[in-house]
Amino acid sequence: MAESMKGLKRTCRCAEVTKADIGKKVTLMGWVQKSRNKGGIIFVDLRDRSGIMQIIFENGPISEEGFEKAAKLRSEFVIAVEGEVMARSGAVNENLATGEIEIRANSLRVLSESETPPFPIEENSKTREEVRLKYRYLDLRRPDLQKNLILRSKVAVLVRQFLADEGFLEIETPILNKSTPEGARDYLVPSRIHPGSFYALPQSPQIFKQLLMCSGYDRYFQIAKCFRDEDLRADRQPEFTQIDMELSFVDVDDVLDVNERLLQKMFALIDVDVPLPIPRMTWQEAMDRFGSDKPDTRFGMELNDVTEVVKNCGFGVFTGAIENGGSVRGINAV
């Protein structure tokens, strides 16, 4: 039976406890990752969004009733533990940020029991996607997905702070609007008040941000939800989020400068250094050098113009293209 957490206050998250806290009393709450009963001692790995902490239950520091409860713990039980931070008496676990310490429990409350989950709550799960989506609330407990959402949150905070420092105002624009010409089909929402009429969900805040420029708000941004009634593909999402901005009284170099510095700070969150200025090329230069308007410059596979070399070769495909004003280009694979 689930117990109440009344009277308990979590003091910190699992990975926030360090060697400097040895000897201190802490209260942790989270999910049981796994439990190992060694007879007179029970080891439990307690997990929350910050990481994992090893909890030790022994008769003496914890009551007999508490020890019996600990013996029944299973994966994904939600528990609250009070105890003392200790240096690990056994081998240090170098795979954990908390691998040098553990909590010797003196109190345990089972806040919620759990049935056996349909798949292991662990990183790099091999579970089929349809099963993971069916139990999405369990899938989102996995550390790799939690890291993604935590990083996304950090990026959003960074973007807001950076653009605020640059003089931008965060202004929300309407979601329910009339249909306007865009690059895809609109999602339509029927109106209850006006039967037979429909709202359109925005494919972008384009018109609204242009109106804001007319209204004197010379630097606007929002982290905007956008909707496009398209099939789901690798580069197409029916619902997506974008960093949307608009500036007045600037030229193209001003826009590029703001975005370059923002990208540099965003990539720094994942320890990737982006030297500035970012190399630039015109569309024509990209097509001439790489044959693409979105070239992958990592490999240096540039096109070489061999028109003069092959113009008299007698090969109809080449000579025909040259006679019509075209050129012959190829990649040097040597």
How should these model regions be labeled?
Residues 1-334:
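Class II aminoacyl-tRNA synthetase catalytic cores and aaRS-like
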